[in-house]
Amino acid sequence: MNRHNVRYVVIGGIAAVLHGVPRATFDLDILIDASRDNAQRLIDALLAAGLGTAALTTADEILANEITVFKDRVRIDAQTSTPGLTFDDAWAHRISMDYQGQPFNVVSRADLIRAKRAAGRPVDLEDVRLLETRDDETG
């Protein structure tokens, strides 16, 4: 996605794992800048990565929905909004991490806690508890 200049941050379960929460997750949740150009860059990046299901949608369809699911070899949930967090805040506070030599953008721990608390599902609240426990251990 970086090669296509997609403005995104990893959120959700994978972000929790990257911040030290021991849990399983089977999809990649990303929060994207909700502009038409950015949504098109996301589609282009997914197609270049071999996710053929990206061809089944348009930038306008992504923007018309809060969540667009791309399910191919992996499941990617592209979100244009998420409870408790704006894209601009997530982007301003993002953290760059590295996986196999590729940098990617991850939501900050504080923003992740805020978003998960706002989502309010039991799994999210458990992630908040574990994230805050890790803060206490490292702080």
Model-derived regions, located:
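Compositionally biased terminal segments of proteins
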Residues: 1-139
